[in-house]
Amino acid sequence: MKKRFFAAFLACSMVLGVFSGCGETETTESQESETLSTGETVSTQGEEKDSVVIAMGPTSEPEAGFDPAFGWGAGEHVHEPLIQSTLTVTNTDLTIGYDLATAYSVSEDGLTWEVTIRTDAMFADGEPLTAEDVAFTYNTVKETSSVNDFTMLDYAEAVDESTVVFHMTREFSIWPYTMAVVGIVPEHAYDSATYGANPIGSGRYILKQWDRGQQVILEANPDYYGEAPKMKRVTILFMEEDAAFLAAQAGQVDLAYTSATYSNEAVSGYRLEAYQSVDNRGFNLPAIASGEETESGVAIGNDFTSDVLVRRALNIGVDRQEMIDNVLNGYGTPAYSVCDQMPWYNSASQVEYDPEGAAALLDEAGWVMGSDGVREKDGVKAELHLLYSNGDSVRQALTADFASQMEALGISCSMEGVGWDTAYDRALSTPLLWGWGAHSPMELYNIYHTIGDTGSAQYSPYSNETVDQYMDEALACSDLEESYTLWQKAQWDGETGVTQEGDIPWVWLVNIDHLYWVREGLQVAEQKIHPHGHGWSVVNNVDQWTWA
């Protein structure tokens, strides 16, 4: 433990050293730290009343830089790109609002989207942003992006300076959610080899400085077309959780990410804030029996979880609140689906903890309790092998807790940590603890919809034609809000779906609260429900933060 603390201290010291004296940006008196007579170091950052220093995890640093074509804003952890503008935005309630767009419409056949954009947006180099830039951006993203699926887009074209038309390959009613995360780049100044490190955008902030592996400094865009940012300077420090905690203790940051591990600690001058998320954790439950393989020879199916009665037993036999209390230290909410609290969530997913009911389902399935406390059926023991990702202590602890609860039901459990290089293949036959959660109903499609002619969903063996049909109809719907009902029916329509009374091919456990140490006096604006990923989402509205 001493070695770990010393390593964290060194990391914290190195990063803070960089922050206080590096590079291209002058260090002003208000950004320096003062040393009190006691030797304690405190930050005077808050004295400016218009700047903030934030500690994020190292994985939050964009490997390819700040280029929307390579995942910035729209990669695995979706967030607002800040440096660039988007056509639309997601509101606090996850409905759609406008940014660059002033209006949009979709053709009756769903294959053409027309978007009108504002005419007062300027790039940071003084050039106007036009529909040509929008079309160029989307065509570039379609051609080069390796982190997002843009197969639904055929091409984009500018029909005049303020109108862009998207020609689709198929109906895609949730296109406005895609438009909310793709930042617009300037056609006249875009070079894929250099843009990521030197982005030019029209968003709320300009990238002032980027020291790879250490920090990013953003400054308010003086020519931004919207309300002027209240926070004029935003410094992001990339550091491990231990170092972020030490930085907060030293008063060197204004907001620092943390986890339940540190939630019992107290940091003088800071409060612990918990923001709700749809950052969920859940096990896939292969819904077909073993014996099949993919074309590449990967084993598919699981004899135990292929029985729907077993899957239903697992779903009501787990005490989610106990997990939250014991693993997350109380910072989380029970998860019943991949999209809890989203506009397209079906509340029929919710279940009560019912160990007696779970035992009855296992009895009904023919799994009889043995004298050794393990159930048997036809001479076969009830066994679950559970996978979790290596190096993730929270997933490991959740897996161990789930295993303990299942053993109380008479199911013998074993655990194994695996790397993501093998996890996807292993999950086709063995339950794996996943992390999901997005601001788009497309995640339902990605998890549950049958993929092509494979006869199965992408991540776990499962298929239901009715569920597929509802999701296809949802994507083909001409009205976005009306499509929510179809997404809900895909979850449960009264007869079939992916909930407890249906096929239940996944068991969802918890939504993890995103925790932050926040300096007293810093007023963080109202947060949307955070998606998967404990990083940039918290600064989606950093321009609206203030100091009291």
Kindly label every feature range from the protein language model.
Residues 211, 215, 315-346, 350, ...:
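Detector for C-terminal structural segments
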Residues 105, 109-112, 148-189:
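Surface-exposed binding/hinge segments that line
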